């Protein structure tokens, strides 16, 4: 159409010239005729350029103008910038409505950020992830981590953990939505240059598919807004970030569940999952597979007062054992399976100036209670790396936790993680059956906020734990850690923002080691380490 308009314009412009040439042909010389033709051609080219420019402006998306700074003489301050051109603030997009041209412009303005989000939503694919990686060295050879779950993470972890999630929307019509989700996680070694998965001599390089499930909305008439999922997935995890373990964690081989179901003032999460375990005999040389199932139920986001919410949770794990498996437990020395449960509540308070604090109370029995008594990592597992063993006799354990962060004025922030635990008549990995324990661990991390991108601070950690075995013998484990750090950040929050690049110097000391006999290199009870670590999520 554009080319046809140009040709028509050219013919109309040439027509008067042709008529004039015919009427004056007899009185003009050849030179005069050529001069008139050249003049008409120049005028035609000028008109064509004018129409072309107008058409280009009409169909090219406009950008929002930016002001140009000038110097005292009125010239642009930097007419030839060395950096690349700045992005436009907005773009024009064409409206799809049929009557858009009648009501106004057929184009509307949209910021680049909104346009990018629109494209992602239209495609329906997202790629999210997390990883950490860094360099470190210590005063006596290779640096070692110790009691991260009690002393804190800064300057005390040398792993390269990662989580990568792929999510694709496959249907979104008529009030119904379907997404396919896959999560890959694992660890990449930070000691040797090679990191082949399966070459696991150092226990570092491994990978797994931790999630592979379908999640939907709109298929359940009684809960159209809830997320209904089926596949390899567990209930949502709740982490004490500074200690790198979870207060709520239900691992799953496969399951079915419902999340964010609005009931009354709050929301319900419920999951029924399978997690088979390896049941060992007393020599820890032979094992048998036992089929277990977990019901995890939570009532969350219950409003209490301004910026405060409550969650109530319960979890029960039972086994579906065969006759031969029970016979092995009765007659062949295999450990008896004992059902286990955990119940509790948590309160989250958000602050006016930013930050939050979360308080939780949990009580458990048998194998979950046993994991309350671990000082290195205390997530509420039913097993130890999938292995089930120990004489569980109905003992219980209690755990109180606090974690959060708070701003103090405009230039200070402090994060905390404090845990108090005790248990009676539990099975301990270190002191055996019928053990009692009591422990307290505390980590605080104050920092000075230079600006949005820089913080300088210290992380202080201390813990002490005492176990008492069936014969009333006492075993003590304790230590402390001091880490000086400077971080490059993209936001001021310590617990809810990443990227974070840390430069640190750490002194860590084991005061007592009667539970694990741990030592650093050269049988030292202390270690000084320096390093740099990057941690990011997206």
Swiss-Prot record:
Q: Which GO terms describe its cellular component?
A: cell outer membrane; pore complex
Identify the stretch(es) annotated as Disordered: 52-82
Question: Which residues pair up as cystines?
Answer: none
SUPFAM superfamilies under this entry?
Porins
Where is this protein primarily located? membrane
| InterPro entries noted in UniProt | G_neg_Bact_CarbUptk_Porin, LamB-type_porin_N_dom, Porin_LamB, Porin_LamB_sf
Q: Which UniProt keywords apply?
A: Cell outer membrane, Ion transport, Membrane, Porin, Signal, Transmembrane, Transmembrane beta strand, Transport
Q: What are the boundaries of the signal sequence?
A: 1-25
> Does the entry feature the keyword Membrane, yes or no?
yes
Q: How does it sit in the membrane?
A: Multi-pass membrane protein
GO MF annotation terms: carbohydrate transmembrane transporter activity; porin activity
Q: Which portions of the chain have biased composition (kind: Polar residues)?
A: 62-73
Which Pfam family name is an example for this entry?
LamB
Name any Gene Ontology BP term.
Answer: polysaccharide transport
What subcellular locations does the record give? Cell outer membrane
Q: Its function?
A: May be a sugar porin with a broad carbohydrate specificity.
- Write down the PANTHER family for this protein, in alphabetical order: CRYPTIC OUTER MEMBRANE PORIN BGLH-RELATED (PTHR38762:SF1)
The similarity annotation says: Belongs to the porin LamB (TC 1.B.3) family.
User: What is the recorded name of this protein?
Assistant: Putative outer membrane porin BglH
According to the entry, what is the taxonomic lineage of the organism?
Bacteria, Pseudomonadati, Pseudomonadota, Gammaproteobacteria, Enterobacterales
Whichever gene encodes this chain, its name is bglH
């Amino acid at each position: 159409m554009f080319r046809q308009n140009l040709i028509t314009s050219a013919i109309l412009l040439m027509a008067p010239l042709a008529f004039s040439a015919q009427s004056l042909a007899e009185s003009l010389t050849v030179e005069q005729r050529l001069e008139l033709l050249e003049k008409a051609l120049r005028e035609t080219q000028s008109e064509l350029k004018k129409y072309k420019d107008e058409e280009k402006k009409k169909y090219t998306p406009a950008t929002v103008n930016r002001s140009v700074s000038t110097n005292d003489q009125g010239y642009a301050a930097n007419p030839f910038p060395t950096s690349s051109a700045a992005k436009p603030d907005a773009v024009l997009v064409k409206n799809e409505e049929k009557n858009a041209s009648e009501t106004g412009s057929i184009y509307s303005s949209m910021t680049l950020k909104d346009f990018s989000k629109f494209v992602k939503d239209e495609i329906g694919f997202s790629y999210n992830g997390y990883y950490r990686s860094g360099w470190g060295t210590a005063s006596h050879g290779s640096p070692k981590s110790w009691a991260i779950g009690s002393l804190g993470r800064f300057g005390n972890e040398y792993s390269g953990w990662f989580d990568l999630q792929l999510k694709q929307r496959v249907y979104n019509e008529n009030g119904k939505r379907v997404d396919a989700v896959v999560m890959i996680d694992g660890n990449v070694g930070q000691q040797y240059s090679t990191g082949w998965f399966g070459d696991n001599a150092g226990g570092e390089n491994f990978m797994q598919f931790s999630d592979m499930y379908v999640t939907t909305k709109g298929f359940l008439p009684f809960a159209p807004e809830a997320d209904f999922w089926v596949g390899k997935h567990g209930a949502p995890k709740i982490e004490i970030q500074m200690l790198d373990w979870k207060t709520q964690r239900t691992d799953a081989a496969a399951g079915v569940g419902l999340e964010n179901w609005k009931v009354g003032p709050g929301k319900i999460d419920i999951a029924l999952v399978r997690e088979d375990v390896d049941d060992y005999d007393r020599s820890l040389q032979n094992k048998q597979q036992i089929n277990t199932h977990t019901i995890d139920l939570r009532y969350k986001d219950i409003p209490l007062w301004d910026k405060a919410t409550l969650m109530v949770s319960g979890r029960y794990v039972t086994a579906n054992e065969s006759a031969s498996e029970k016979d092995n437990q009765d007659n062949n020395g295999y450990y008896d399976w004992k059902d286990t449960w955990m119940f509790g509540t948590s309160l989250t308070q958000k602050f006016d100036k930013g930050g939050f604090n979360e308080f939780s109370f949990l009580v458990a029995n048998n194998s979950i209670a046993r994991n309350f008594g671990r000082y290195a990592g205390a997530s509420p597992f039913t097993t130890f790396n999938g292995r089930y063993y120990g004489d569980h006799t109905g003992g219980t354990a209690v755990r109180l936790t606090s974690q959060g962060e708070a701003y103090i004025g405009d230039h200070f922030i402090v994060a905390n993680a404090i845990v108090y635990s005790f248990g009676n008549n539990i099975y301990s990995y270190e002191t055996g059956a019928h053990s009692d324990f009591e422990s307290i661990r505390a980590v605080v991390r104050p920092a000075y906020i230079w600006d949005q991108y820089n913080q300088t601070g210290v992380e202080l950690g201390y813990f002490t734990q005492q176990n008492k075995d069936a014969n009333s013998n006492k075993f003590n484990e304790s230590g402390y850690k001091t880490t000086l750090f400077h971080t490059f950040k993209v936001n001021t929050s310590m617990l809810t923002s990443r990227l974070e690049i840390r430069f640190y110097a750490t002194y860590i000391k084991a005061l007592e080691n009667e539970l694990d006999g741990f030592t650093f290199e050269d049988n030292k009870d202390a270690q000084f380490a320096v390093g740099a670590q990057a941690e990011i999520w997206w």
